[in-house]
């Protein structure tokens, strides 16, 4: 019983840490035409590679929702759905496909996640702002944001073996 409680506490703390990082990176962005470029995709993709799909949704979806709620509330529901789905797909691909080739599974996951993020935000912006032109204006920057998040998370996970480190932490 105590072992299960300790594992649940560790899982909760690791998930909360990644969610806090997501919220912090949602608080500022690089100015670009039509808005800002945010770096929280790095945390969303990295956490999704490391954590299970439930924790990935909490970090990606709920973390982005809270970040938007605090700093820029207009797209907060788009962020909840888009980043939540993005994180779940990345996590599922990283943990349940190509088990003998985890790097390939992670690359597949972040690639699918990038597509989900770009499509979700493009459709969401067109709906929220009532103009597809605004969504198209932001499209190249959404692609750049998704690419930066995907590539950086793969590099972080490969170079520093973050999945192995966090799996050891979560097993204790």
Protein language model annotation of sequence segments:
Residues 1-172:
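Loop-helix junctions at membrane interfaces
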């Amino acid at each position: 019983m105590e072992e299960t409680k300790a594992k649940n506490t560790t899982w909760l703390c690791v998930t909360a840490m990644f969610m806090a990082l997501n919220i912090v990176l949602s608080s500022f962005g690089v100015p670009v035409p039509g808005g800002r470029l945010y770096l929280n995709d790095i945390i969303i993709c990295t956490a999704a590679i490391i954590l299970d799909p439930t924790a990935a949704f909490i970090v990606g979806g709920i973390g982005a929702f809270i970040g938007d709620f605090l700093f820029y509330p207009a797209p907060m529901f788009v962020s909840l759905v888009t980043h939540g789905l993005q994180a779940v797909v990345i996590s599922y691909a990283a943990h349940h496909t190509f088990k003998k080739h985890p790097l390939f599974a992670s690359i597949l996951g972040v690639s699918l996640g990038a597509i989900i993020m770009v499509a979700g935000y493009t459709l969401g912006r067109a709906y929220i702002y009532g103009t597809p032109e605004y969504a198209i204006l932001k499209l190249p920057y959404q692609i750049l944001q998704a690419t930066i998040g995907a590539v950086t998370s793969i590099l972080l996970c490969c170079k520093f073996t973050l999945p192995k480190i966090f799996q050891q932490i979560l097993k204790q």
